[in-house]
Swiss-Prot record:
Pfam families the record matches: Ldh_1_C, Ldh_1_N
Entry's Gene Ontology BP terms: lactate metabolic process; tricarboxylic acid cycle
Entry's EC annotation: 1.1.1.37
Membrane spanning residue stretches: none
Species assigned in the record: Rickettsia typhi (strain ATCC VR-144 / Wilmington)
HAMAP family: Malate_dehydrog_3
Lineage: Bacteria, Pseudomonadati, Pseudomonadota, Alphaproteobacteria, Rickettsiales
Function description: Catalyzes the reversible oxidation of malate to oxaloacetate.
Keyword Membrane: no
UniProt: substrate binding residues: R84, R90, N122, R153
Family to which the UniProt record says this protein belongs: Belongs to the LDH/MDH superfamily. MDH type 3 family.
Record's keyword terms, sorted: NAD, Oxidoreductase, Tricarboxylic acid cycle
Record: residues binding NAD(+): G11, S12, G13, N14, I15, G16, D35, N97, I120, T121, N122
Keyword check for Disulfide bond: no
Gene of this entry: mdh
Protein name: Malate dehydrogenase
């Protein structure tokens, strides 16, 4: 019998619990659900494992408060940290979540040095940078969940605008996972037809697309304002699963993620959202798109915003 991959989830809140459920339904591997809150990961693990029996998933799920249980993990997904509340930006979380991420990184360094690490905790681009520097893991094995989620929101709004299936929509959102993200209309298509061409055909307007871009940038904030007591978790979890699956199954999918750049896009020593190929080695390649002058200005503005936050924690 082939041994199941070991997947550790650091943080057992809404995203962590949803991740565990999705992993069990997809039968991607055995799960360790970690949290500092006693009883929470154990209770959720038991509940999800009972649900997994209905799905016919023969996997093990262990809830724990002990980091030693993540030892030998093939992949680790990190959601630990304070979530956003109404009126807060992702950046407002930086101080407390940096300390949490440093602690998580030290334990991954101790117990799971060979793992592929996906960071979800906000502010994303800064937290994944902290993870890399504190853990000492290779940069191709540490990425952040950003563009997959942002693109999924952009895809939904475009599908609604053009009244087509979301399966027909492909989009790319570059930059930091925040208000300065850069949805690339020129690289976004409906069944291969670029959005600017569809606008010329009279199927939409520049004004409507601009509204969609603004809504995409505020996609997380819109959900926070509606929930009032937390932030999005279904779509972030589904986005991380797409990244995890590409790694575990060596799918070599092109996904937009927060990746460590070393000169690509003229960016050095920084995590920023760009298209990458994910396979069994982790990040196989950064896809460097040719940007127009206007797109480059927006992208550079997003980079500057991330740099300022990095400087603030150093």
């Amino acid at each position: 019998m082939t041994k199941n991959p070991k997947i550790s989830l650091i943080g057992s809140g809404n995203i962590g619990g949803t991740l565990a459920h999705l992993i069990s339904l997809k039968k991607l591997g055995d799960i360790v659900l970690f949290d500092v809150a006693e009883g929470v990961p154990q209770g959720k693990a038991l509940d999800i494992m009972q649900a997994a029996t209905i799905a016919g998933a023969d996997i093990k799920i262990k809830g724990t408060n002990n980091y030693k249980d993540i030892e030998g993990s093939d992949a680790v997904i990190i959601t630990a940290g304070l979530p956003r509340k109404p009126g807060m930006s992702r950046d407002d979380l930086i101080s407390v979540n940096t300390k949490i991420m440093q602690d998580v990184a030290q334990n991954i360094k101790k117990y799971a040095r060979n793992a592929f690490v996906i960071v979800i905790t906000n502010p994303l681009d800064i937290m994944v940078y902290v993870m890399l520097k504190e853990s000492g893991l290779p940069h191709n094995k540490v990425i952040g969940m950003a563009g997959v989620l942002d693109s999924s929101r952009f895809n939904l709004f475009l599908a609604e605008e053009f009244k087509v299936s979301v399966r027909n929509v492909n989009s790319i959102v570059l930059g930091g996972h925040g208000d300065a993200m850069v949805p690339l209309v020129r690289y976004s298509t409906i069944s291969g037809v670029p959005i600017p061409d569809l606008i010329k055909m009279g199927l939409s307007s520049n004004k409507n697309i601009e509204k969609i871009i603004d809504r995409t940038r505020n996609g997380g904030g819109e959900i926070v304002a509606l929930l009032k007591t937390g932030s999005a978790y279904y779509a972030p979890a589904a986005s991380a699963i797409a990244m995890l699956e590409s790694y575990l199954k060596d799918k070599r999918q092109i996904l937009t993620c927060a990746a460590y750049l070393q000169g690509e896009y003229d960016v050095h020593d920084l995590y920023i959202g760009v298209p990458i190929i994910i396979g069994k080695e982790g990040v196989i390649k950064v896809i460097e798109l040719q940007l127009t002058e206007e797109e480059k200005i927006l992208f550079d503005k997003s980079v500057v915003g991330v740099k300022k936050l990095i400087d603030a924690i150093q």
